[in-house]
Amino acid sequence: MPSIAKLPDIVANKISAGEVVQRPASVVKELLENSIDSGASAITVVIKEAGRQLVRIIDNGCGMDSDDALLSVERFATSKISDVDDLNALRTLGFRGEALASISSVSHFELKTRRQSEPVGIQLISNGGEIEGPQPAQCEPGTSISVRNLFFNVPARRKFLKSNATEFKHIHETVKAFVLAYPEIEWRLINDDHELFYFRTPDVRERLSHFYGEGFGESLIEVTEENDYMTIGGYLGKPGMMVRQKYDQYFYINRRLIQNRMLVQAVQQAYAELLEERQSPFALLFLGLDPSLVDVNVHPAKLEVKFEDEKSIRSMVYPVVKRAVRTADFSPEATVAPSPAPVGSHGIGLPESSSRKLAYSDFSGKSSTTGDLYRNYRQGAFDLSGASVPPPSIDPVESSFGSGSGEPYPSMVQESLLTPSADQPSAADEQNPVAPDKEPKIWQLHNKYIICQIKTGLMIIDQHVAHERVLYERAIDVMNEAVPNSQQLLFPQKIDLKPWQYEVYEEISEELYRLGFTIRPFGGLSVMIEGVPPDVRDGNEATILQDMIAEYQENASKLKLEKRDNLAKSYSCRNAIMTGQKLDVEQMRMLIDRLFATRMPYVCPHGRPVIIRLSLGELDRMFGRT
């Protein structure tokens, strides 16, 4: 008896499903491709419990008769190609004929379909690959496919699904990619019985503004280029619209969404110096190419493609994008500086009462890492040789970064670095006053690093991660306090969140409250920010919240972090002073004092170094003085 046997179809389909169906979003993608290929002009997506309970796709496409419906759930059965040469002329999104077979083998699957010319439709059911039907059924023209209890018979795969917020985020991103690529189709998305959008008009800019905020679509740079080899069209973001994640870059070949590193790099390099560190431009680009010049059959999910001549593609995309962003008007609109905030309001304004203090825990006595290096810094930077320098302590202070300098704030300086009020010197200053005519030996390098003379040489501090460490420890301590500390806004801010953002917000709302955010639902996907932690810069409340949610979600998908730890990391990263922000001597001095008052001043919350020391001995060796 031979030891090699052909696998039963039901087993083969489950194996195939491991490549084709990785998560609920994979089901959505495959079914939407079929709906588009059917010629549908209206598509509805219904989701329950992030696709675990239900994924339903309803379209008004051509529909199927009973024979085609039965064949559609068979492996390698398709109407889109008939021989190998057809792969070189693909105009459809699907072509392998394995999606429905794979999906139906790992779910409770129901298909209803009807041709326009037929008075009655048909229904077909599959429970884990066991087919029932087809049988007559009343239904609208087109096709409706319901996928329930995904992976019910593959518990290992179901176990490895992420949180509902993460899984729905992938679903929403998948649907959004199709919505932007097919404006001629009416799109409707319903999640847990709530309609998230219903697009009836073929206006891409309108759809972009829905997803990214009012006016977003109108402010984009439109790109149009064509030659005998390829067409390029789409939209690009201006520098003020840059994002820190690459979720918002969409590349299509013949309206098929793809992932391609070369295209990402070409766009990134075309923007060049217009980008700040870690920024990426928004891009929605459609490339039209002869199907014979691109192979889409190189990836199970059809996301990756192989170009016949990748260099030619890049040589067109790069100059087109570069020319578009170089010729666009990037000058910012003039804005009127806000008048000083009244006493007691959030942000920078008139001197506030010294009775308004932050409720952060006193760090004095907690730090065990400030010792010799802090003394070296104080003695070297302020010429306090021989003086007794105690570890820094942080008393309750006011959120008025630089308020004692007497100079206006630089436009990009983060006001959230806490400094003592004018009538409340720090403990270190009280015991070691610095003569007013003695300039501290502290400098800022390229608005990025702080350089200090210390008794034994030189100390270099990364200003962003230093402030990140300070904010992180404060956030952890505040969330562990009995009573949250929140600075109420004079004018509450309404924010419209994306569906996946709202899911994350609901997940972390309690921790946000303990951190100091006072937020209440405001109908639909909107929330109202009524209060924020005192560290948050005035006018930056909405941006900080949305950036925190994005950072939290990214951390959750990559790292296994406790919820409060994740939120504290997200808050500190997004709220810290950034590279490019100029600090004056007093601001740098206070940042250093706050850093050395933390429990772990040498590394940031993500493990990056904060401080580098260079001793006189090492410098002497470099110059051959030893």
UniProtKB/Swiss-Prot annotation:
The keyword DNA repair applies. PROSITE patterns: DNA_MISMATCH_REPAIR_1. InterPro entries: DNA_mismatch_repair_CS, DNA_mismatch_repair_MutL, DNA_mismatch_S5_2-like, HATPase_C_sf, MutL/Mlh/PMS, MutL/Mlh/Pms-like, MutL_C, MutL_C_dimsub. Keywords: DNA damage, DNA repair. Pfam families: DNA_mis_repair, HATPase_c_3, MutL_C. It comes from the Bacteria. GO terms for molecular function: ATP binding; ATP hydrolysis activity; ATP-dependent DNA damage sensor activity; mismatched DNA binding. One of its GO terms (cellular component) is mismatch repair complex. Residues 385-413, 418-437 are annotated as: Disordered. One of its GO terms (biological process) is mismatch repair. NCBIfam families: mutl. This protein is involved in the repair of mismatches in DNA. It is required for dam-dependent methyl-directed DNA mismatch repair. May act as a 'molecular matchmaker', a protein that promotes the formation of a stable complex between two or more DNA-binding proteins in an ATP-dependent manner without itself being part of a final effector complex. Belongs to the DNA mismatch repair MutL/HexB family. HAMAP family: DNA_mis_repair. PANTHER family: DNA MISMATCH REPAIR PROTEIN MLH, PMS, MUTL, DNA MISMATCH REPAIR PROTEIN MLH1. This is DNA mismatch repair protein MutL. It comes from Chlorobaculum parvum (strain DSM 263 / NCIMB 8327) (Chlorobium vibrioforme subsp. thiosulfatophilum).
